[in-house]
Amino acid sequence: MSTARFIKCVTVGDGAVGKTCMLISYTSNTFPTDYVPTVFDNFSANVVVDGSTVNLGLWDTAGQEDYNRLRPLSYRGADVFLLAFSLLSRASYENISKKWIPELRHYAPTVPIVLVGTKLDLREDRQYLIDHPGATPITTAQGEELKKAIGAAVYLECSSKTQQNVKAVFDAAIKVVLQPPKPKKKRKKTRPCVFL
């Protein structure tokens, strides 16, 4: 019997976008009700995806600026990044391009990225939107647009509270590592035939 392949998956994104909740929801099927800013936490689980067993190492990072110098230490050896933003925070969405992509490409230029929009359950929650008049929900189309702009392998939206698509996020991360997307072939420019 062969040993399971180890995959290091690192969550990255602004503080309070739901990175830790997503990890807890995935690993324990529970939703934490209190917000506790993360320093660094690691989880490990054996997971079967498409018949392959992998040992998925989950690394949580703190998005707060206080950790800008520490956070990159967790990037070493990463196989895939889960780059998260809140579907209810325009600032966290904009920081994907402004802050996170430059940081990830500086420290880990070739590691694939799964872009994740979190808090999906709140995007259509009328009461939440009434209580938070400044919230401008990010649409699925905007998420797909950002995926293309940053060169992410996949874009998914999830809710840690309802667990909608949470497993799909981690399955996608594993698949990106096990079956990397084939690079697109550049078509050669052909000259038209000219007969004399």
Swiss-Prot record:
Query: What parts of the sequence cross the membrane?
Result: none
Predominant location: cytoplasm
Top-level taxon in the UniProt lineage: Eukaryota
Q: Which GO terms describe its biological process?
A: small GTPase-mediated signal transduction
Return the SUPFAM superfamilies for the record. P-loop containing nucleoside triphosphate hydrolases
Query: Which residues belong to the propeptide?
Result: 194-196
Q: Where is the lipid attached (S-geranylgeranyl cysteine)?
A: 193
**UniProt similarity note:** Belongs to the small GTPase superfamily. Rho family.
Briefly, what is this protein's role? Inactive GDP-bound Rho GTPases reside in the cytosol, are found in a complex with Rho GDP-dissociation inhibitors (Rho GDIs), and are released from the GDI protein in order to translocate to membranes upon activation.
What name appears for this protein in its UniProt entry?
Rac-like GTP-binding protein RAC2
Protein source organism: Lotus japonicus (Lotus corniculatus var. japonicus)
